[in-house]
């Protein structure tokens, strides 16, 4: 391999909203960039063993790879000179609600306008939509033409985005919003809220309305500002292909608490290069200390399945027998439900499996919400749950992200999972702080059975420990007859519930 001269300078020039040019770097500088943007492909089935995130012919790279080059240069003592666009923060007074313990929202707005492309990483309940609304307000005040599109990926988030934007702009005279949803495409307004599934459907070969398709393509290509909510779930190859149709963008904002997923190296690279990478981030720990998020503890209940007689090795079969239909495990869950009901704690139980959700609903009589529940009924059950004193609700993964449920005191992650981003998103449902609530609890299961179940449980445990610390995580063995009393004491002490707790709430 040819030796690279460390003293050579990398010269980078912004040539468009989406690309940098590094051809003025000289031979050694070009080699540095090539090395920085060449990665080993972790997939054993990949056509190529390496991934290159630069154009070898044009000597360009996408905007999101700049920070990777700067990090490489710092680690290898290489000089970097960047000739970038000079964006100033608009001289508009930022909303006064973004102050005090919410100062991070002001900082996020300012960081965005210095770059105009990138990801803002704020923990769940940190005010991502609030930040987007203020960025939108400034855009509407400083840009007298050009349209804004806010993309979500489910009905609940769509409805919540509309409500949040409407409430935010009420002090500014309101906001006229168009919709792209369930086959309906109204792009006549300056601001549009869309479901990505509807956009995909209209652009697909299944859509026979050529006029609608043509109008949507024209709208997307002429769009000036794109905002993608929960981008970690909205960056598949098919969705990125749609975003890249938007050649006229001058602003691009992505929102997420967990933009990059563990074990998804290739997809993370694709998201990074397209999005502009992270431009602002604040931690859950800081927001807890400021009182934006509630303090919380984690309780994990160990369930030992090793004595279970199960000869099948298929993972889906094991999941059904040992998790969804397990009398032992469901018995532990039912006892937990009984304890929390007696204490009057508002509890959300989250399920990955709708089948499991139905089983528990039939056993307990607790209402449930899933993707099969109509939009109106979903909102009605959610409102009834949040407005009630105490109470319980079962919900599928449609509630794992974005949905505002600040009144919830206890979250039970019923059927686990591996992905740390999902664990972080789920626990975010319970971390909201209100005038009457400043403490929360997450309850999960540690399933002891073969390598997959143990590893998945351990991964979630590590995610909790990394988030809140060892001292705030309790693990109880449900095989120990004293676990019920221990769990009661932990929950009672954390929420300051008296011994005669049925009369306390």
Predicted ranges, named:
Residues 225, 230-297, 464:
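Post-DEXD/H (motif II) to motif III coupling segment of the RecA-like Helicase ATP-binding lobe
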Residues 159, 175-188, 348-350, 355-359, ...:
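Conserved helicase ATPase core of P-loop NTP-dependent helicases/translocases
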Residues 310-362:
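Conserved interdomain hinge at the start of the Helicase C-terminal
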Residues 371-466:
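Conserved RecA-like P-loop NTPase helicase motor core
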Residues 52-53, 75, 81-121:
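Conserved pre-motif I regulatory segment
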């Amino acid at each position: 391999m040819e030796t690279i001269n460390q003293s050579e300078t990398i010269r980078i020039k912004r040539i468009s909203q989406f690309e940098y040019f590094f051809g003025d770097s000289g031979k050694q500088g070009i080699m540095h960039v090539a090395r920085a943007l060449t990665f080993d492909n972790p997939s054993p089935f990949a056509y190529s063993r390496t991934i290159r995130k630069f154009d070898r012919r044009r000597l360009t790279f996408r905007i999101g790879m700049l920070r990777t080059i700067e990090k490489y240069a710092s680690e290898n003592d290489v000089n970097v000179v960047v000739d970038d666009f000079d964006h100033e923060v608009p001289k508009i007074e930022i909303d006064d609600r973004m102050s005090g313990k919410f100062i991070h929202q002001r900082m996020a707005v300012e960081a965005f306008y210095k770059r105009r492309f990138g990801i803002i990483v704020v923990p769940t309940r940190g005010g991502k939509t609030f930040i987007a609304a203020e960025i939108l307000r400034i855009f509407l005040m400083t840009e007298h033409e050009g349209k804004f599109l806010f993309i979500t990926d489910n009905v609940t988030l769509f409805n919540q985005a509309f409500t949040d934007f409407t409430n935010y702009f009420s002090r500014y005279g309101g906001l006229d919003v168009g919709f792209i949803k369930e086959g309906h495409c109204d792009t006549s307004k300056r601001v549009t809220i869309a479901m990505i599934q509807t956009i995909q459907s209209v652009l697909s070969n299944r859509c026979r309305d050529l006029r609608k398709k043509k109008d949507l393509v024209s709208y997307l290509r002429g769009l000036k500002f794109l905002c993608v909510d929960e981008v970690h779930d909205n960056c598949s190859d098919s969705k990125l292909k749609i975003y890249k149709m938007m050649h006229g963008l001058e602003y691009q904002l992505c929102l997420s608490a967990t933009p990059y997923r563990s074990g998804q190296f290739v997809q993370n690279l694709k998201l990074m290069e397209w999005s502009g990478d992270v431009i602002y981030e604040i931690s859950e720990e800081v927001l807890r200390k400021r009182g934006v998020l509630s303090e919380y503890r984690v309780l994990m209940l160990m369930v030992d399945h090793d004595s279970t007689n199960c000869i099948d090795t298929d993972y889906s079969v094991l999941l059904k027998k040992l998790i969804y239909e397990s009398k032992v495990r469901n018995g532990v869950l039912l006892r937990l439900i009984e304890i929390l009901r007696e204490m009057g704690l508002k509890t959300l139980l989250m399920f990955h499996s709708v089948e499991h959700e139905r089983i528990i609903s039939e056993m307990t009589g607790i209402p449930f919400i899933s993707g099969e529940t109509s939009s109106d009924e979903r909102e009605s059950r959610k409102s009834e749950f949040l407005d009630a004193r105490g109470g319980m609700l079962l919900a599928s993964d449609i509630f794992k992200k974005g949905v505002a449920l600040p009144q919830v005191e206890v979250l039970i992650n019923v059927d686990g999972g591996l992905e740390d981003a999902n664990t972080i998103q789920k626990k975010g449902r319970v971390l909201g702080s209100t005038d009457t609530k400043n403490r929360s609890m997450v309850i999960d299961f540690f399933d002891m059975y073969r390598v997959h179940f143990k590893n998945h449980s351990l991964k979630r445990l590590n995610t909790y420990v990394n988030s809140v610390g060892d001292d705030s995580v309790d693990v109880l063995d449900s095989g120990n007859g004293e676990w019920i009393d221990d769990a009661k004491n932990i929950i009672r002490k954390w929420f300051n519930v008296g011994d005669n707790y049925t009369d306390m709430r």
